[in-house]
Amino acid sequence: MDKHTDVVIVGAGPAGLAAACAARSCGLTVTLLDEQAAPGGQLLRNVESPLAQALMDPREREAGLRLVEDFRGSGATYVPRAVVWGMEGRCLSFSVDNVPQRLSAANVILAPGGMERPVPFPGWTLPGVMGAGGADILLRSGGSLTADKDAPVVLAGNGPLLLLLAGHLLDAGVRIAAWLDTGSLSQRLLSGAAMPAALLDPPYLGKGLRMALRVLRGGVPVIRNARDIRALGADSLEKVSYAAKGETRELPAAVLLRHEGIIPRVQICNALGARLLWDRVQRCWYPDVDANGRTSLDGLYVAGDGAYVHGGDASRLKGWLAGIDAARRLGVISPAEAGRRAAGARRKLAVLRAARGFLRYVFAPDPKIFDVPDETLVCRCECVSAGAIRKAVAEGFHEVNEVKRVTS
């Protein structure tokens, strides 16, 4: 492998693949590093596998296959099973099959995608409790959640991924005992102002409606305004407890799938010192980037859901814009040529971002989900409870690393 490249991309999801295609179309040398064994990221995981294809929306499947095909034919250097563990300036340290390597680049495009919002709750460490994203990965990889399809599965939380997962579970013949909806009613009421913009993207709204109808037709009981969710059991999950309409109730469950939305992966940006911004509605940090994904650090871009969660279609466009701008930055193409190549993607992205603003409120997390009992484990590795963290903050330790030091 070359020790230097024009562009190194981290992440082979829709944004990373599109960025590679865009940069290569301008003649740049490109190396793409990804920890998975095949391209696609989380959204298009195993898209080249017939098993995964069977679970995907036909339009997304065909678009994903075309994107992967374009990437494989682009001439970019593809390094699967690469774990990036260090970055100094624009020099990356990574390992492939436990062999350390280094690679420098004139431009770095981070495309880490999004991650499930971590929300601890009583009993979340019990066997049988999973995140919705992990469950969907298991299904796409040919696994099953339970040995018995009639074993009750409970969904809990808020977010479009739960709609998608519910459809996949129903298609697989899994019995969904209930969906405990934890969404914020007040924020959903605020979404009305953004509804007209959402109408600019009928296919996306149509997809959401189809997923919702699939859940309704599947007879899944939806319990609104569920609070105080707890996983109960001795050695593994046996029941799920929740509060609704002033009463506490229990449901038998073999599996509990919890999900409270997708947020950007900002760990690398944060470690590098790139400027971050706070979203008060979605209650998450995201990188401060311009229209092309440029961060506050020279030569560092963030593309896709790692910049802000707008979904797969928007991620492709963000990746394309970052790849084109990387070529402009190196002087390989003129600003005018960059503008011409980016114009179509900009127009489409503007529509998608406006439409996604509606979902920002519809699937906003309710702050009450973070109000967990003191005995709730927050860090299972160090056995740190919510109460220990609150005690540290009350004693004046307000910086994250300080809290980690005094509670570990």
Segments predicted by a language model, with ranges:
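Residues forming the flavin
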Residues: M1-T407
